[in-house]
Amino acid sequence: MAASPVLAVDNSSVAADQLKSIIERIERLEEEKAGLAGDIKDVYAEAKANGFDTKVLRKIISIRKRDHEERQEEEAILELYMQALGMA
């Protein structure tokens, strides 16, 4: 038995409304993300103006995001490789 045309229109209308809502939410979040990226850029500029090395700041932030054990393992491997190359 085929679905009635009214039911098909209602389902497609609901799907269209959901899709529109999802797209609008993503667009709003993308705008917020762009605003936050601008704020972060401003903080780095402030740090640089105060004499801080922004490359080092970015590295520290990257390190702080990682798990302590994962970071220790990577540092141990780095030390091993540097010793193998006569750099340590």
From Swiss-Prot:
InterPro entries: GapR-like, GapR-like_DNA-bd, WH-like_DNA-bd_sf. One of its GO terms (molecular function) is DNA binding. Pfam families: GapR_DNA-bd. Belongs to the UPF0335 family. This is UPF0335 protein Mnod_5968. It comes from Methylobacterium nodulans (strain LMG 21967 / CNCM I-2342 / ORS 2060).
